[in-house]
Structure formats: C-alpha cells, structure tokens
Amino acid sequence: MKKVSFVFLVVALNSVVLGENDPFEEINRTTLKINKTLDAVIATPVATLYQKVTPDFIEVGIYNVISNVDDINISLNNILQGKIKEGLSDIARFTVNSTLGLGGFIDVASKMGLQKHNEDFGQTLGFWGVPHGPYIMLPGLGPSSLRDTVGMIPDAFLSPRILLNHEPTIYSLKFLDLIDTRARYLGLESIVIGDEYLFIKDAYYQNREFDTLDGEVEDDFDNWDDF
C-alpha cells in the first residue's frame, strides 16, 4: 500500500515540475475543453459506431494497413538516429507486409520475427538532445510539445501518403487513422486521476520519454522494494 501511495506521489510531483515549462497553460486548458467537446460530439460517437459495425478482423486489418504505411517514416527516423539495423528491419517489414501481407492488411512480418518499432521526427530530435520546449495542447489533436509539433512537419513529408497525389484519398486515410486510434482508446477516460489537464500532460511526457528511450527508462522504484 505504501508503495502504491509513493507511485501516486511521484506522478503528482512530476506534474508540478512539468508545470514549470507550461507558459501556455491558460490557452492549453481552453483548448483541452474544446477538444473534449469535439471528442464527445464527433470523435467518440463515430469511433463507437465504427467499433460496433466493423468486424474484429477488419478492424485489425485496417490498423495493420495504417501501421504498415508508417513503417517507411519509422525506418527513416531510425536511420537518422543511427539505428541502421532497426531501420533496415522496418524496410523489410514494409516490403513483406506490402506483398505477402496483402498491402499490409495481414501482419506477416511480425510472425516472421521482424519487430514493429515506434519512431518519429520528434523522437529523433529528442535523441539528438533537443529539449521538449513548452507544452502545447493542439486543437483536435491533443497533447504535444514545441519539439514534437515541429517534428510533425517532416513526418508529414516523409509519409508515403503524400505520394498518392489524390487529396480525397489522403484525407480519408488520415480520418480513418484518427477514428481507428480513437476506437482503440475508448473507455480510457476512467483512469484519469485528479486534475485532468495535469494528468494528461504528465502522461504525455512520460510516454514520450519511454518512446524516445526505446523503453529503456530508468526504474526509480528499484530501491523501494521493501515498501
């Protein structure tokens, strides 16, 4: 019980520390309210309907297709971080899934032992020591930082979607990506503890640190096993 209490204490303290780099908090809180309204009125109903009418194997397949397209961008960012082996593995994943996996609908590559990675240009900047900068709540998109927001620009140009040269298709894929993502996170609102704004901000930074360090985050609780 003491260990659990300590965990929540650390989360609370982290929120206070992160608040020091939040000069746009007033605007961010307003944006969060707008995002919650948009989510309640549009995103959640559409995602709920999508989840109800879409068979599980189709839903998984759609996720796989979107994930497969992202492997090109992931590969380039791995290479930019000097992780050549991982970058080549991402290219192999894309090739295998695009051919044997029917355009990525079936994740054949994972079954072959080709691990799925998670990289973007924001993480690449972080890898090379660029700090997050101010916390930003983006309208319609959610939590971000100045660094990660800037990173979205090259990520957009590195995505194979722009090669389609057909705006309706590009926007349809993006919309489907957003709805599929929202559907997979339905119900998570119940885990929010305390001030929702601070909770989301802290969770965002913790998640980005985990991603940037490839999961190799120092465990602060190794010395608390006796609690």
Regions found by a protein language model. Name each.
Residues A40-N73:
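N-terminal, post-signal-peptide region of Sec/Tat-exported proteins
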